[in-house]
From Swiss-Prot:
Protein name: Phosphatidylglycerol--prolipoprotein diacylglyceryl transferase
Main location per the UniProt record: membrane
Pfam families: LGT (PF01790)
GO molecular function terms noted in the UniProt entry: phosphatidylglycerol-prolipoprotein diacylglyceryl transferase activity
The protein's enzyme class: transferase
Gene that this sequence comes from: lgt
Cell compartment(s), UniProt: Cell membrane
GO biological process: lipoprotein biosynthetic process
UniProt pathway: Protein modification; lipoprotein biosynthesis (diacylglyceryl transfer)
Recorded family membership: Belongs to the Lgt family.
Transmembrane parts of this sequence: 20-40, 54-74, 94-114, 175-195, 205-225, 235-255
Length: 261
């Protein structure tokens, strides 16, 4: 049956401590990052990388990744933020882009790898499982903020009531595209964790290549269903970037097998 109480949406604030408001969005982001660090620290010794290097990398990459996510979003919504500059830093209300975070994180990773004399593909292979998991969790922050949704649908009877309630936006039920992407990235995480030490012949960078192809494909499909995509003219920016990710992932995978040394 249809949800009889669509107004029972979740509060964006999880906990209020006097003037300090702790948002669900922040909890999912920080929680995902913490799990990603834990996973990377467990894997690092197997690649002869110190856990201290992982911690140091995260201390640089995490804050700059958040800045990158926000900056990317603001750039493509400049028509709004140019008129409301005070809202530029209000990320607690939502408004971050995963691709912006990935771009910033990649820059930090390559610079960090150079100065610590760590092969960047080793560091990427170590961190990718955590990135998958953090992305899967982060989409639930979008869920609470009522972001990353799709077209209007007549009902969502196939979903639990708490999701139906939150997907009732502006008087209509919306397709929960956040959920599709969360499931897609969680599936990628499970596949990597199950097979990365079971498949013989994996080369340095293969896990990273898999991430680029898998996430690029998932994001391309999901982005096509969203109605709040960041646009550049008539084009969905994230779909173009998704195609680029798939191409780079395939090229890297093939190149690593053609390279003799």
């Amino acid at each position: 049956m249809n949800n009889l109480f669509p107004f029972l949406a979740l509060n964006k604030i999880a906990l209020q401590l006097g003037p300090l408001a702790i948002h669900w969005y922040a909890i999912f982001i920080v929680g995902g990052a913490a799990l990603a660090v834990w996973l990377a620290c467990k894997e690092a010794p197997k690649r002869n990388i110190k856990t201290d290097d992982i911690i140091d990398f995260v201390l640089f990459a995490f804050p700059l990744g958040i800045v990158g996510a926000r900056l990317y979003y603001v750039i493509f919504q400049w028509s709004y933020y140019s008129q409301h500059p005070s809202q530029i830093i209000a990320m607690w209300d939502g408004g971050g882009a995963i691709y912006g975070s990935l771009i910033a994180g990649a820059i930090v990773l390559f610079v960090f790898s150079y100065y610590r004399m760590i092969h960047p593909l080793d560091l990427l292979d170590i961190t990718i499982p955590g990135v998958f998991l953090a992305q899967a969790m982060g989409r639930w922050g979008n869920f609470v903020n009522q972001e990353a949704y799709g077209k209007i649908v007549s009902n969502l009877d196939w979903l639990p009531a708490f999701i139906r309630n939150q997907m009732f936006i502006d008087g209509h039920y919306r397709m929960p595209t956040f959920l599709f992407e969360s499931i897609g990235t969680l599936s990628g995480f499970i596949l990597v964790m199950v097979f990365r030490h079971r498949i013989k012949g994996l080369k340095r960078g293969d896990i990273f290549s898999f991430y680029l192809v898998w996430y690029g494909a998932v994001r391309f499909i999901v982005e096509g269903m969203r109605t709040d995509s960041l646009m550049l003219g008539p084009a969905r920016v994230s779909q173009w970037l998704s195609v680029l990710l798939v191409i780079v992932g395939l090229v890297l995978f093939i190149y690593r097998r053609m390279k003799k040394n």
